[in-house]
Every structure is written in C-alpha cells, then in structure tokens.
C-alpha cells in the first residue's frame, strides 16, 4: 500500500525498513513530506525539529533514525578537513515483530516534535574546530494507530556547521566508557567465570553454524551471478569478489578467539525494547539480548532471522572484519533486495540474508532458551 504520493517516485530507492542517517542515500525531493531541521543548542548539543509537511498523519518508527532513543548515529559528523568523525556508539539490530506503540512517534499534519542529543556521547571529537553535521534517512511508517509498517518517508536535514571545543567535548560522559565487563568469550578461547555454561554452548553453536553458512556462501558467490544480483543489484566482478571475501572474513571471525569479542550477555546494559543484539564497531564487540536466545537455531522460513544469521549480521558491523564496516541501511529481504548496489554492499543484512537464503542447508530446530 502506498499513500504518500510525495515520495512515491523514490520509494524503490529508500525501501529499507530501518535506515541509519547516511550521506549515501539519494538526494531528497524538493518537497519533503518529513522535514528535519538541525539547530545548535550548545558546544556539542543539537536539537532536531522533525515536522510533518504532509496532509496526513504520520506514525513514524523511531528505530535507527534521528529519533532513536538509543545511543546510535543520529547525524553524520565531518571535521573541517573533510575527515569523518569516528562513531563510538552502538549499531542495534531490532526485531520488527510485535512492535509496540511506544516505539512510534505520531505526527499530525504540520505538527513538529523535537529531539535533543549530544553528539559527543557517540563521536570521538578529539580536535577543536568546525564540524559539519547532516542527516539523511528513510523512516518506516505505519498507518493510523496501527504498528504494521506499510511505507517509508525520506528526510534530509540542513547542513549544520558548529564550532566545537574539544576540551569541553571531552568532559561529556560517553555512552560506552572503558570499564571492565564480564561475560565474554575471551581471546584465548576460555570461558569467563560469569558466562554460564548454557549461554556459552548456545553462542558457541551459533558461531559454528555462522562460520559454516558464511563460508559456504562465500565459496558459492561466483557460481550464480543472478542470485548475487538479486541481493546486491549487480554482477560486477569486483563487487562479487568483495562480497565473497567479506563473507569468508566473517566466517573466519565467527570463532571464540578471533578479532571480535563475543559477549555472553548484555554487560553494557543497552538491550532496550526490541533489540536482538548490538555491536560497538569502535571496540569490535558484540552483545546478545534476550530476543537472540529465543530465535531459532535454524529457521525454516526463507530469508528469516535465526541465531547464526544474526551473528553474521553483527560480524559485518565490525571493522576488524569488514572495512569499511557495514551499516544498517535496511532490514528484511523485501527491503534489502531493492537497495542500490552501493548501499547493498555496505548493508549488514544483505550479507546475512544472502547467506541464509541461498545456502541454509540444515533442518529447522526451534530452541527456546532459558536464561539460567
């Protein structure tokens, strides 16, 4: 169903269900249904004013957008010398099942909502000087009071230039401080004393399966160009080589003592509503949330989510495995298969769904996990 005629012409390009603000999305239409204005409110504080310019109410999903309440990338931040600032926040993978009304923002026509955030909490602002902030993205939309996603609205903010004092920015508490966290499969392959045997076995099995699935997908890339085109929008040899190499790197990283630190539980305390798992790309760490443990070991639904493909998705977010690390430009087969190639190649779900959809060779087994 399409009911936002102002964006119908670009809906095929912005089809991702969830999209991080990104500089790679197509140019915004001149008459945007959703208008976003960035306003400076302090050294590193920003206010985003989101306005519904359309003639119908919008029920906007906040996940992975400028309205996300988690410490995610709300804006792109670029130093005056052209260098993009390191992102130190989280890349959450959200479950799209049973979405509650609380994760939506409802905007009547011409109404606005304000979101205030501090970019210093999730960006490494190590140098004083001028920074340019901008935001682009596609917001999933439900109709009326419903929570079923039926469309997307595109937004592009103004470019905001801010003079930032790095010394003041350094005083802002970071979303993820350097402290000791337990519950990790350590780099020597041992088991942390706080990681229960049950959780250890669940994650170890999922890693083994992810390694097998990603490796099989990597080896099969060259054998079916049309299947590759289905997921990545191209059969360019360089793109196929890149995906094959990345899938093999993901397979090799799906181990206890590899480049990724796999945690047994949410020792960072960021498993908020509908978060399945999340990655800290600046630290190459992955944290599972309770929805992860209730996923199938192997799903019998084509292109569906299970434990191994969730770990493949998270591995693609880690710069120790994939450079540049993948973002979340879209979730789900219907959306990722319509991304333009440059976004598909940098979208974590394209890798996990491609691997699961084509090379998932195991019988389905549903395991409901007990946290004890």
From Swiss-Prot:
Keywords carried by this UniProt record: Cleavage on pair of basic residues, Disulfide bond, Hydrolase, Metal-binding, Metalloprotease, Protease, Secreted, Signal, Virulence, Zinc, Zymogen
Cofactor(s), by name: Zn(2+)
Keyword Signal assigned: yes
Cofactor descriptive note: Binds 1 zinc ion per subunit.
Positions of the propeptide segment: 20-188
InterPro entries in UniProt: Fungal_M35_metalloproteases, MetalloPept_cat_dom_sf, Peptidase_M35
GO-annotated molecular function: metal ion binding; metalloendopeptidase activity
A Pfam family reported for this protein in Swiss-Prot or TrEMBL: Peptidase_M35
Active site per UniProt: 314
Protein name: Neutral protease 2 homolog MGYG_06241
Natural source organism: Arthroderma gypseum (strain ATCC MYA-4604 / CBS 118893) (Microsporum gypseum)
């Amino acid at each position: 169903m399409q009911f936002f005629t102002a964006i119908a012409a670009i809906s095929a390009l912005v089809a991702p269900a969830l999209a991080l603000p990104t500089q790679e999305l197509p140019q915004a239409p001149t008459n945007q249904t959703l208008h976003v204005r960035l306003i400076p409110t302090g050294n590193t504080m920003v206010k985003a004013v989101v306005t519904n310019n359309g003639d119908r109410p919008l029920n906007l999903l906040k996940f992975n957008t400028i309205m996300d309440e988690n410490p995610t990338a709300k804006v792109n931040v670029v130093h005056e010398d052209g260098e993009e600032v390191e992102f130190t926040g989280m890349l959450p993978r959200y479950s799209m099942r049973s979405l509650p009304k609380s994760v939506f923002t409802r905007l009547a026509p011409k109404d606005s909502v304000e979101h205030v955030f501090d970019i210093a909490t999730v960006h490494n602002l190590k140098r004083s000087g001028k920074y340019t902030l901008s935001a682009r993205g596609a917001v999933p939309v439900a109709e009326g009071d419903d929570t079923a996603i039926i469309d997307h609205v595109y937004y592009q903010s103004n470019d905001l230039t801010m003079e930032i004092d790095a010394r003041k920015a350094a005083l802002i508490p970071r979303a993820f401080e350097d402290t000791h966290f337990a519950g990790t499969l350590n780099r020597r392959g041992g088991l942390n004393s706080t990681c229960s045997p049950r959780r250890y076995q669940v994650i170890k099995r999922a890693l083994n399966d992810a390694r097998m699935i990603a490796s099989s997908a990597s080896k099969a890339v060259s054998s079916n160009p049309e299947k590759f085109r289905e997921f990545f929008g191209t059969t360019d040899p360089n793109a196929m080589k890149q995906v094959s190499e990345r899938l093999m790197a993901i397979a090799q990283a799906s181990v206890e003592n590899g480049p990724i630190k796999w945690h047994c539980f949410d020792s960072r305390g960021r498993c908020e509503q509908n978060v399945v798992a999340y990655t800290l790309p600046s630290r190459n760490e992955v944290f599972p949330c309770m929805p992860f443990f209730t996923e199938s070991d192997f799903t019998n639904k084509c292109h569906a989510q299970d434990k191994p493909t969730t770990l493949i998705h998270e591995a693609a977010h880690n710069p120790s495995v994939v450079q540049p690390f993948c973002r979340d430009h879209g979730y789900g087969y219907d959306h990722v298969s319509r991304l333009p190639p440059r976004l598909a190649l940098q979208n974590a779900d394209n890798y996990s769904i491609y691997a699961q959809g084509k090379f998932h060779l195991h019988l389905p087994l549903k395991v409901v996990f007990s946290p004890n």
